[in-house]
From Swiss-Prot:
Ubiquitinated by the CUL4A-RBX1-DDB1-DCAF1/VprBP E3 ubiquitin-protein ligase complex for ubiquitination and subsequent proteasome-dependent degradation. Interacts with NHERF1, HGS and AGAP2. Interacts with SGSM3. Interacts (via FERM domain) with MPP1. Interacts with LAYN and WWC1. Interacts with the CUL4A-RBX1-DDB1-VprBP/DCAF1 E3 ubiquitin-protein ligase complex. The unphosphorylated form interacts (via FERM domain) with VPRBP/DCAF1. Interacts (via FERM domain) with NOP53; the interaction is direct. Interacts with SCHIP1; the interaction is direct. Residues 18-307 form the FERM domain. It is found in: Cell membrane; Cell projection; Cytoplasm, Cytoskeleton; Nucleus. Probable regulator of the Hippo/SWH (Sav/Wts/Hpo) signaling pathway, a signaling pathway that plays a pivotal role in tumor suppression by restricting proliferation and promoting apoptosis. Along with WWC1 can synergistically induce the phosphorylation of LATS1 and LATS2 and can probably function in the regulation of the Hippo/SWH (Sav/Wts/Hpo) signaling pathway. May act as a membrane stabilizing protein. May inhibit PI3 kinase by binding to AGAP2 and impairing its stimulating activity. The keyword Electron transport does not apply. One of its GO terms (biological process) is regulation of protein stability. The modification Phosphoserine is found at S9, S514. It comes from Rattus norvegicus (Rat). Pfam families: ERM_C, ERM_helical, FERM_C, FERM_M, FERM_N. The gene is Nf2. The lineage of its organism: Eukaryota, Metazoa, Chordata, Craniata, Vertebrata. InterPro entries: Band_41_domain (IPR019749), ERM (IPR011174), ERM_C_dom (IPR011259), ERM_FERM_C (IPR041789), ERM_helical (IPR046810), Ez/rad/moesin-like (IPR000798), FERM/acyl-CoA-bd_prot_sf (IPR014352), FERM_2 (IPR035963). It comes from the Eukaryota. This is Merlin.
């Protein structure tokens, strides 16, 4: 009995739960999990907490002896080879990548998680990104974080603490942080009006065209023992030279692969075309082969699903996303309208004050003009009085000269000399009298003119006083009749099930599927032409500052691909050619 009681008490003390820490790209969460929980139970809990419905892209990642592994959905969490120390840590990350982010990523939370993960891969240089594309991507990252550019807020140096460019790009050019900020800000200013989700989607649309985007690389060896790289992505399997991760030596698109399998460390790829030999290679660990097969199965399933009609769940999500987008657009319009009305109200509130200030300025100017008019009138009156007195004095002198002349004429001069002298004096007196008369006449005219000027000055003074009186009696607050702004037209509601583009075909119809893929590539290249022109323009701007001696092998390879026109992800895929039953040489 005692032994049974001891066993029962020990059984009761065993923990029923354990703690798990989930690390996302921008947060950490902790959960208490039951001991019996499987991977799917924990994964579903995390997705519900995040509000994530596009679960097929994601997984819970952990590390085993420097090897990446993913939590299996049908296996108990604690049965995995994970640390038993609590909390058990998993990273919630994107396991599979979309071919076209804009069409496939529906929810805003999905787009945001992909944006954060891809941005980190580019900054950590796990995905090669050319310098001109790095600057453009940085400008969209700034738009997503800070919103619209405002020179009064986003002043010089506001990006000093931000990590926006790969260190490789910064070291490659003889440019200061201020010069990089200037170029990023120039692009950033052009993104005005884009919301956070729109800026993040533009980031992903550019990033998805990078050669290393979404590719998982594994070190392998072929039958000859040559070391190669295997790349697994949304489009298929690719074989690379270890020194060149940008351009595959050969590719196997998912629609051209018949079977994938592994036995111990040997991995086998069987092409659909039986004329092409089976490709076999060896990996370093059995665990790596399991991971490769997981990624192959998941990517192949998504590849085939994209080329079929959307499921009802996806259609509903897309309809809800459209409704949410329309709601946010309407909300942005409402906020913009409220901002405009607020600015107009502030202007209306300040208008009376501005009017009063303007009227004060007008009154001051009118008063100064009046004072100047009064001073001018006083001066003119004084001058007119002086001129009039001078004219009277000259007239008096002229009369005296005339009297003197008459007196001299009347005086009898006896001697001839006196007579001659007298005649000369008479002549001089006549000339002087004539000059006096002319000067008197001129002064009289000048006095008349001054009187006229005085009269005009008085009239100007009267008008200035009248204007000052009008300003003083003018109403300060004119009546205003605000006209309410019209409301925007109603945005149409959306049905739960919206229209969707259908690619319905049988899985066995591989020829038709291949034609569809080629058509998608052509359409994609047309869409990316404008973006490439923008990137070429920026590349030309900064090319002169490049330090050639600091170029990495990937920089040189990318430049060669750009010169040959094969820098696009779609252009680098090389398919195996069927030429009899010859083996594939890599």
């Amino acid at each position: 009995i005692a032994s049974r009681m001891s066993f029962s008490s020990l059984k009761r003390k065993q923990p029923k739960t354990f703690t798990v820490r989930i690390v996302t790209m921008d947060a950490e969460m902790e959960f208490n999990c039951e001991m019996k929980w499987k991977g799917k139970d924990l994964f579903d809990l995390v997705c519900r907490t995040l509000g994530l419905r596009e679960t097929w892209f994601f997984g819970l990642q952990y590390t085993i002896k420097d090897t990446v592994a993913w939590l299996k959905m049908d296996k108990k969490v604690l049965d995995h080879d994970v640390s038993k120390e609590e909390p058990v840590t998993f990273h919630f990350l994107a396991k599979f990548y979309p071919e076209n982010a804009e069409e496939e990523l529906v929810q805003e939370i999905t787009q945001h998680l992909f944006f954060l993960q891809v941005k980190k891969q580019i900054l950590d240089e796990k995905v090669y990104c050319p310098p001109e594309a790095s600057v453009l991507l940085a400008s969209y990252a700034v738009q997503a974080k800070y919103g619209d550019y405002d020179p009064s807020v986003h002043k010089r140096g506001f990006l000093a603490q931000e990590e926006l460019l790969p260190k490789r790009v910064i070291n490659l050019y003889q440019m200061t942080p201020e010069m990089w900020e200037e170029r990023i800000t120039a692009w950033y200013a052009e993104h005005r009006g884009r919301a956070r989700d729109e800026a993040e989607m533009e980031y992903l649309k550019i990033a998805q065209d990078l050669e290393m985007y979404g590719v998982n690389y594994f070190t392998i060896r072929n039958k000859k023992g040559t070391e190669l790289l295997l790349g697994v992505d949304a489009l298929g399997l690719h074989i690379y030279d270890p020194e060149n991760r940008l351009t595959p030596k050969i590719s196997f698109p998912w629609n051209e692969i018949r079977n994938i399998s592994y036995s111990d460390k040997e991995f086998t790829i069987k092409p659909l075309d039986k004329k092409i030999d089976v490709f076999k290679f060896n990996s370093s660990k059995l665990r790596v082969n399991k991971l490769i097969l997981q990624l192959c199965i998941g990517n192949h399933d998504l590849f085939m699903r994209r080329r079929k009609a959307d499921s009802l769940e996806v259609q509903q999500m897309k309809a809800q996303a459209r409704e949410e987008k329309a709601r946010k657009q309407m909300e942005r319009q409402r906020l913009a309208r409220e901002k405009q009305m607020r600015e107009e109200a502030e202007r209306s509130r300040d208008e009376p004050e501005r009017r009063v200030l303007h009227m004060k300025e007008e009154a001051t100017m009118a008063n100064e003009a009046l004072m100047r008019s009064e001073e001018t009138a006083d001066l003119l009156a004084e001058k007119a009085q002086i001129t009039e007195e001078e004219a009277k004095l000259l007239a008096q002198k002229a009369a005296e000269a005339e009297q003197e002349m008459q007196r001299i004429k009347a005086t009898a001069i006896r001697t001839e000399e006196e007579k001659r002298l007298m005649e000369q004096k008479v002549l001089e007196a006549e000339v002087l009298a004539l000059k006096m008369a002319e000067e008197s006449e001129r002064r009289a005219k000048e006095a008349d003119q001054l009187k006229q000027d005085l009269q005009e000055a008085r009239e100007a003074e009267r008008r200035a006083k009248q204007k000052l009186l009008e300003i003083a009696t003018k109403p300060t607050y004119p009546p205003m009749n605000p006209i309410p702004a019209p409301l925007p037209p109603d945005i149409p509601s959306f049905d739960i099930i919206g229209d969707s583009l259908s690619f319905d075909f049988k899985d066995t119809d591989m020829k038709r599927l291949s034609m569809e893929i080629e058509k998608e590539k052509v359409e994609y290249m047309e869409k990316s032409k404008h973006l490439q022109e923008q990137l070429n323009e920026l590349k030309t701007e900064i090319e002169a500052l490049k330090l050639k001696e600091r170029e990495t092998a990937l920089d040189i390879l990318h430049s060669e691909h750009s010169d040959s026109g094969t820098s696009s992800k779609h252009n680098t895929i090389k398919k195996p050619q069927a030429q009899g039953r010859r083996p594939i040489c890599i």
